[in-house]
A protein has these predicted regions:
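N-terminal, membrane-interfacial amphipathic/helix-forming hydrophobic leader that caps
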Residues: 1-114, 118, 126, 131, ...
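Hydrophobic alpha-helical transmembrane segments
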Residues: 2-9, 41-52, 140-151, 166-169, ...
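Membrane-interface interhelical loops and short interface/amphipathic helices
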Residues: 123-153
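Transmembrane helix-loop-helix hairpins at the membrane interface
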Residues: 112-116, 145-265
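Juxtamembrane inter-helical linkers in multi-pass membrane proteins
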Residues: 83-91, 136-144, 197
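Short helix-terminus and kink motifs of transmembrane alpha helices
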Residues: 34-38, 121-126, 179, 183-184, ...
């Protein structure tokens, strides 16, 4: 179904302002992940859990940053206004018309994203840390190793407060924090500086924002460019990046639910 649609004009950022917004997101995440998290490892149940708390705070800050930037643009925070300024709208075709059939592109994008995450991202990460070994994940940081230990699995069973923390972290990661900042705020405002390559610049910035987990920078730049930014740019809808990125949240939610129910012991 096609409808006439006027894609609203949003202010365009200079390269300097884009980098300032990027730094406002990347800087706190790096500090929380590498300094605050380790400092609180004892009282928060170990380094992986302390980093989880710290990164969650950083992602919540990114949502606050989105609101600050919207307010500074001078518009209202009413949904009817915000949804247009953040591209939280139905997809738009090349003729500038709302075309709900374009939602079907989500199916192959989600499949490709899953294949990339399960079969390719590990290879990309290995290549990246071979090229830059100082970016390798410290063993004490590994959430996978933490979750794999029998002691941790036993402690997680029935720990619904921790399950809620994971849900909050994932929601702010792939919906209203990280993803909304990069695909809702930055991407619509980068064409003035980067032209038709705005989606690529957005994905590269997304990858190199991950100073809190630099072992994943290259992989995040690849999926951030091709799977999140490019479809969001083509269809003028940040929902594409949000939904595709949230596939990993759904996957991890089911894994965690199994741990909470003690099914993995």
């Amino acid at each position: 179904m096609q409808q006439r649609s006027t894609v609203p004009q949003v202010p365009q950022y200079s390269v300097g302002k884009i980098l300032l917004v990027w730094a406002a997101a990347a800087g706190p995440m790096a500090v929380l992940g590498w300094i605050v998290g380790p400092a609180l490892a004892g009282p928060l149940g170990g380094l992986p859990m302390a980093r989880l708390w710290g990164i969650t705070v950083g992602l919540i800050w990114q949502f606050v940053l989105v609101l600050i930037l919207l307010r500074r643009e001078g518009g209202t925070l009413r949904w009817a206004d915000v949804r247009e300024r953040l591209w939280l709208r139905a997809p738009v075709n090349a003729a500038g018309r709302t075309d709900r059939r374009l939602w079907w592109w989500l199916a192959p994008l989600i499949i490709v994203s899953a294949v990339y995450a399960l079969m390719i991202s590990g290879v990309v990460e290995d290549l990246w840390v071979k090229l830059f070994p100082f970016f390798a994940e410290p063993a004490s940081f590994s959430m996978n190793a933490f979750m794999a230990s029998p002691e941790s699995r036993a402690a997680l069973a029935g720990n619904w407060g921790l399950f809620l923390l994971f849900l909050v972290q994932m929601f702010f990661n792939t919906v209203i924090g990280e993803e909304l900042l990069f695909r809702g705020i930055l991407l619509p405002r980068m064409a003035g500086a980067f032209g038709r390559w705005d989606w690529l610049a957005n994905g590269i910035l997304f990858g190199f924002y991950h100073w809190h987990q630099p072992w994943g920078m290259l992989g995040s730049a690849i999926d951030g460019s091709l799977l999140y930014a490019l479809p969001s740019r083509l269809f003028k809808s940040a929902w594409f990046g949000i939904i595709v990125h949230s596939g990993q949240s759904v996957y991890f939610t089911f894994l965690l639910l199994g741990l909470m129910l003690g099914l993995a012991n």
